[in-house]
Design a protein with these regions (language model features):
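Structural motif
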Residues: 28-30, 200, 277-278, 282
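N-terminal Rossmann-like or analogous alpha/beta NTP/dinucleotide-binding catalytic cores
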Residues: 2-130, 134, 225-226, 230-243, ...
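Active-site cores that bind ATP or allylic diphosphates and position pyrophosphate for catalysis
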Residues: 124-263, 270-274, 326
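Short secondary-structure transition/capping segments
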Residues: 94-109, 133-139, 162-170, 290-305
Length: 326
């Protein structure tokens, strides 16, 4: 299966619909902001729209106060969206915590195809089994529970509630990423059977984003390179559910000068702190400089970057945040 995803045209028959899809588990940091800026520019430079979706599947870790703050931060930066979040719109709900019934419908379609099975393995068991890992650090599931009989499932269910996985074939998925170029993954070898639903009933990221992007009319997904390895799984889900797949562009990660990934948990360069030191235009301009969109870190508004935006300018390698840039 091949999904072309090259963003080169300034005008298209149907303008693209991009999206912001932050997880409100803390304040936005520079890496989140850079990805949001690129998503906004990619869509706006071709006359497109932006949807804001709040990815709060785990509601306990994502209090609504953080969702409200990230809306304020995006608005302050000038990254205005057209629908979603607290603004609402025709494709709601826009908060994943409110979409369980919608996800259940798609989950049931996959279950009806005979592709879903219960998994009783713990994370500790998987790591102890020395199974191979995906490029994003997750364990590639070795299929331990794939062939359980009905009797075995009934017996194990007495002791532990299962999670549920999607069975994948030994098949290559090939697509052309709008930033990273051609990419191929084998579903069985590189991904493995993956979670659709946790043991506590919460739906997994892979299913939720596919269902949401399709029902919201998203035609291009711009996100961090750490999610590149999710794309093959999601393209497979689009096919199984009979949904149109968007184009993808995975932007390089923004790293601290010492090579660490920026983290909400560590408070790295959070917008809460940056707003006390810089104007919105200074932050946008310095991020644009770091990502090759302008030759110097001069203050810029997002709108001023639209005419000259091109994915050809964006590096393919992770970007080390220059010392003293922020």
């Amino acid at each position: 299966m091949q999904e072309q995803a090259v963003f080169t045209q300034k005008t298209e028959p149907v303008p693209p619909t991009g999206r912001f899809a932050p997880s409100p588990s803390g304040r936005l940091h520079l890496g989140n902001l850079a990805c949001s800026l690129l998503a906004w520019l990619s869509a706006r430079s071709r006359g497109g729209r932006i949807v804001l979706r709040i990815e709060d599947l785990d509601a306990e870790r994502c209090p609504r106060v953080y969702a409200d703050l990230l809306e304020q931060d995006l608005d302050w930066l000038g990254l205005v969206w057209d629908e979603g979040g607290s603004h609402g719109g025709p494709h709601g709900p826009y908060y994943q915590s409110e979409c369980a019934a919608i996800y259940t419908e798609s989950y049931n379609k996959l279950e009806a195809q005979g592709l879903v099975y219960p998994c009783f393995c713990s994370r500790a068991q998987l790591h102890a089994a020395s199974a191979p890992h995906t490029s994003d650090g997750n364990v590639i599931y070795p299929g331990t529970c794939r062939g359980l009989t009905a009797e075995q499932i009934a017996e194990k269910s007495k002791k532990k509630a299962p999670a549920y996985r999607l069975m994948v074939p030994d098949e290559d998925i090939t697509f052309t990423d709008g930033c990273m170029g051609p990419h191929t993954e084998n579903l069985l070898r590189d991904c493995g059977d993956f979670y659709l639903r946790r043991a506590d009933g919460v739906f997994a990221y892979q299913l939720a984003v596919v269902v949401d992007d399709a029902r919201m009319g998203v035609t291009e997904v711009v996100r961090g390179a750490d999610l590149l390895s999710s794309t093959a799984r999601q393209l497979y889900l689009y096919r199984l559910l009979g949904l149109p797949a968007p184009k993808f562009a995975h932007c390089p990660l923004l790293l601290a000068p010492d090579g660490r990934r920026l983290s909400k948990r560590d408070g790295d360069q959070s917008l809460e702190n940056l707003r006390a030191k810089y104007t919105a235009q200074e932050i946008v301009g310095r991020l644009a400089f770091a990502y090759g969109l302008q030759p110097e870190p001069a203050p810029r508004t997002p709108e001023s970057l639209i005419p000259d935006f091109s994915w050809d300018k964006v590096p393919k390698q992770d970007i080390y945040l220059p010392e003293n840039l922020f």
